[in-house]
């Protein structure tokens, strides 16, 4: 039971995409390489002054905005990531890396890039 308090700490980190570990790394001047898929070679993104973060969207409510830009036939995960990106939830990321293995995630990443270009 003593170890459960440590598990709670890590569980709380997962409540926000931009958690205290990411904020500390950014304060230390590190570059955040955000990625969308487990097929990305994560060790290669953690070289030098970079650190990697797999994007996720905890506590997502409505997907209305993302569904406007992407069809409702695409998976909820890709739409949730786009919804969170539109809300500004991934502004901590310095770059976005998306694998070419999933058309739905590619579509979400393309919309994120288009949205960022207009900001």
Name every feature range the model reports, one short phrase each.
Residues 1-118:
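An N-terminal assembly and electron-transfer interface module characteristic of large anaerobic redox
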């Amino acid at each position: 039971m003593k170890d459960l308090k440590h598990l709670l700490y890590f569980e709380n980190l997962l409540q926000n995409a931009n958690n205290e570990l990411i904020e500390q790394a950014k304060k230390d001047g590190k570059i955040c390489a955000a990625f969308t898929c487990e097929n990305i070679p994560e060790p290669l993104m953690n070289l030098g002054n970079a650190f990697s973060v797999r994007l996720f969207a905890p506590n997502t409510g409505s997907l209305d905005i993302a569904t406007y830009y992407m069809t409702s036939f695409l998976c909820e995960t890709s739409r949730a990531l786009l919804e969170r990106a539109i809300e500004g939830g991934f502004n901590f990321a310095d770059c976005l890396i998306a694998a070419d293995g999933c058309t739905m995630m590619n579509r979400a990443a393309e919309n994120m890039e288009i949205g960022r270009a207009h900001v």
